[in-house]
Amino acid sequence: KALEVGERHRVLQLPTGTGYQATLLSRLCRWVYTREPDRVVRRAAEKRFRSLGVRNVVAHAGEAEGGWPEQAPFDRILLSTGFDDAPAALLEQLQPDGVLVVPLGPDPLVRSVTRITRTGGGFEREQLLTLPPAVLGAI
């Protein structure tokens, strides 16, 4: 809901993990681009995509903080990896009026899910909720 995904959107989802989030997003938008640094994990997710008939997800090797500049710009970016602050490389890959949702905060055990919207004058941030340690890994 916080991502406000539309059927014509191009979404970057990081990291791929099991492919669950990318599969859900694939039902809501035009294209999902996802990156995963672990080759075994990525290949397992790609196999799941094929077995489910998901054809609008593109998976590639790579780290979350770099995004996917070759495929940018994106209408939406969803990260399940937390950061102290939003990586500048990802903010640069947002379309105007694009939205990034990411767990942020200096304490890796307690992060706040934050929505960042690219505006004409920069970026607006909205803290949505703070996750306790037991929930953080389940995003």
Q: What residue ranges belong to the model's regions?
A:
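Conserved histidine-centered catalytic loops in small-molecule metabolism enzymes
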Residues: T119, R125-A138
